[in-house]
Regions:
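Extreme N-terminal starter segment of soluble prokaryotic enzymes
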Residues: 1-5
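Active-site metal-binding loops of divalent metal-dependent hydrolases
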Residues: 8-10, 174
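Conserved N-terminal subdomain of the carbohydrate kinase-like
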Residues: 12-21, 40-122
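Histidine-anchored nucleotide/phosphate-binding helix
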Residues: 27-36
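Short beta->alpha connector loops
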Residues: 50, 127-131, 150-155, 174-177
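A conserved, positively charged/aromatic
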Residues: 117, 160-167
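Short beta-strand/loop segments at the ligand-binding rim of alpha/beta enzyme cores
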Residues: 139-149
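Conserved phosphate-donor
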Residues: 168-175, 180-201
């Protein structure tokens, strides 16, 4: 079996006006997908508050093959959430203050969490996580495979600093950035995946 850990973003989308909830976050989505494959032992490592959003998230994955024993409950913090708005045509959009996510953005891993990650075969993290630098440092001296989601980040010079340590590099993009990642793929050993929305990857 392959031991996979996804961290640290567990959040809810909260739809304005209806307060309808959807569980998500890069780590949660990756873990749910990976749990469909029997060869993976999947764990989530992250943090939630002691609130209704946390309960909703944990209930949403209770029937999945995902170990949640490494999810911290931080009583003095709010579970990450993203207030989502809809246009008249039904398209989602966000405001500057939509995201409430200090629990993820400022998360620092403790000794036990770092030791657990070291023993994993595959580690998934997103670039904006507060613990991203810790994961890169761990990767330099450990043999796990590292997958990183850069989402819509566009500082390619900054990205390239991490390329030597990343085995699977993911980013949401457009055709215009493909030459950049083609060049990266010839220079570094990792796999570079650019998601082009309805045009595939």
């Amino acid at each position: 079996m392959i031991n996979l850990v996804a961290l640290p973003c567990l959040c809810v989308d909260v739809f304005d006006g209806t307060d309808e909830l959807y569980a998500g976050g890069e780590a949660l989505n990756f873990a749910v997908h990976a749990s469909k494959f029997e060869e993976f032992n999947v764990s989530i490592l992250g943090a939630v508050g002691q609130d209704s959003y946390a309960k909703f998230i944990m209930d949403s994955i209770s029937d999945k093959r995902i170990d949640v024993s490494h999810v911290r409950v931080e009583k003095d913090k709010v579970t990450a959430n993203n207030r989502t708005y809809l246009t008249a045509g039904g398209d989602r959009y966000y405001k500057d203050d939509s995201w409430t996510g200090d629990i993820v953005d400022k998360m620092i891993l403790n000794h036990d969490e770092l030791e657990f990650i070291k023993k994993s075969d595959v580690v998934f993290v997103h670039f904006w996580a507060g613990c991203f630098g810790q994961i890169i440092d761990l990767k330099k001296n450990n043999n796990f495979r590292l997958a990183v989601d850069f989402v819509e980040y566009r500082n390619f010079k900054e990205m390239e600093k991490y390329a030597p340590y990343i085995d699977y590099f993911m980013i949401s993009g457009e055709k215009s950035i493909l030459p950049i990642f083609e060049a990266f793929s010839k220079k570094y050993k990792g796999l570079f995946n650019v998601s082009l929305a309805d045009k595939g990857s």
